[in-house]
Each structure stands twice: as C-alpha cells, then as structure tokens.
C-alpha cells in the first residue's frame, strides 16, 4: 500500500476533520465496541474466559482512556470517555476529551455526532461492521473470525492475542488483558504499525441500560451526511 498512514490507529480527528478522518474514527469505535464483549474474569485459560464472556454477557458499560502512538513512536494522542453496549448490535460511545463526540448504534444504523460542529454522519450497521471485530456484536463466532492464543501474564494481567483470520481488515492484531474479573487493557496494532492502548475502569457486566441510550435523533439544525 502506497498511501501514507493516518495519524492515529484509532484516530481522534480535530474539529472540521475531513470525512475520511471521521470514517477512521468510526472504525476505531467499532473496534472498541467489539472489545466490550471481551471483559471477563481472569482464569488460567484466558481464551476460555473470552469465549464464555462472548456467549454469556449481554450488556456492559465502562469508562476508558485511550493513547495512540505512531509507528515511529514519536507522536501520541490521548482521548477518553465512556461506553455502553447491549447485544445485539447496540452501542454508545461518549467521548469527553479532547472534544465531545457521540457515536450511537441503534441496531440498524450508526450515528456519529460532533457536538461542537453540530455535524452528524450516518451509515447502515451492516455496511460498517463487515469483517471487523465489531462483527462480534452481531453474534459472529469469535473462533470463526479470530485465531486466539493465550499469552503470558504480566504485572497481574492475563493476556489473550486475537488475530483476525481475514487479512484485509483495519488492524493486524489485538491483545486483551484481564486483571481479576475485570477488563484491564486492550492493545490494538493497526496495519500501519500504529498502536492504541485502551485502559478501562468502572466496568459493569450485564448492566441494566436505558433503551434511550441507544437511540439518536439529529439535533435541530445539524448537518446530516449519509454515507
């Protein structure tokens, strides 16, 4: 591939970013959405824990911080916020820093709202998921989509390496780490060598979530773009 790599593996576009940057941000959100399904208790076999959680957990919520490092290690970008998910296919991400952005899937469409610019982009969920990790939200088999391998524990965190079987996706691999019964961290390595580290706190599995959290109506005066 001859194109230049994007600035961030899970990018946070500046105000007024181009549509391509928003699409990259959406792909990052899809990755994060699918990772919500991976939070479970750490046992001797973290791979089995992952499979059990995909099967048994129907909803969840957490806070997150995210740091993206460029392939050369010179540039870093940070963001943070909260997320919620509810199977099948519904999720919500509320970014609070460095600026406010809301990403909502109602099970049919995905809405991305830049609050500062009052801009909304929308696309159908089935067009957005494809073979990405977010397909797990649609009930895909984790073993069908990924090769899983337990990795050595480090500093009290148990790790699972998930490598997509399809090689034309948005990332090379991801590592999911558990501490005790809670998701501790996720590392995503994209196809340009950029690495995203996601750290989770206040995770709650099978949480009762208000239905309206997964609904979105564009605010009055918003510029809405169908993709």
Predicted regions: what is each one?
Residues 2, 36, 42-76, 218-227:
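N-terminal leader/targeting segments and the immediate start of mature chains
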Residues 29-39:
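Bacterial N-terminal signal peptides
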Residues 3-30:
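Bacterial N-terminal signal peptides that target proteins for export
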Residues 54, 129-143:
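Short, solvent-exposed helix-to-loop capping segments enriched in aromatics
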Residues 75-81, 194:
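Amphipathic hydrophobic-ligand
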Residues 65-71, 94-96, 113-115, 163-165, ...:
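A generic structural motif
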Residues 82-131, 196-197:
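An acidic-aromatic
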Residues 121, 141-227:
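Gly/Pro-enriched, hydrophobic low-complexity segments
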